[in-house]
Amino acid sequence: MMLCACAFTAHAQGNTSQTTDIKKSKKMLVVFFSRTGENYAVGNIEKGNTHIIAKMIAKETGSKLFQIETVKPYPDEYKACVDVAKTEKENNARPEVKSDIAVEDYDVIFLGFPNWWGDMPMAVYTFIEKHDWNGKTVVPFCTHEGSGLSGTERKLKDVCKGSTISKGLAVRGTTAQNSLSQARQSVEKWLKSVLQSK
């Protein structure tokens, strides 16, 4: 089963579907988790799919960029990583992460991740649970190979207590790696939507 496989596709309700006026916000941050090594559909990669999209967003918005990294690296070999990710999800694990950044100091947080088993990697939950999200605007984005955002917008609404979850972006990993111009167009179009006034 693919890391990006999911059992369902769902659209977030309530605040998750609205665009938010974040032009007036003082500080924006792009936080992401990404993985290199052997990857589904694109082979061995030196820069992760989500990392590529995160850099585009940071450049377009002038945001600071922060990468979530685990203390224990995930296996480079694809199948081994799939197995680890599945076990972590089944156990609702919280892998230890290397470093941190105070999201409390920012108004808007773009949060990026690969779609693993229809969910965010468990390390993203580790990061989220370290922080107070009250009053923040969280803007999710993910890379995938067919599953899109799955139910992650709704899950973010549950775990980022007190925040507003804005319209998310899903980009195929193959597009991020092999069609940069297409990926950039998707990012730019999406940003125009989420940055506009309600």
What residue ranges belong to the model's regions?
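Helix-loop-strand module that forms the ligand-binding subsite of alpha/beta enzymes
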Residues: 77-164
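Solvent-exposed loop/turn segments at secondary-structure junctions
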Residues: 35-38, 70-75, 115-119, 144-149, ...
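Bacterial Sec-dependent N-terminal signal peptides
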Residues: 1-14
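Structural signal for conserved beta-strand scaffold positions within catalytic alpha/beta enzyme cores
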Residues: 32, 67, 140, 167-170
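A charged, well-structured terminal subsegment
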Residues: 165-198
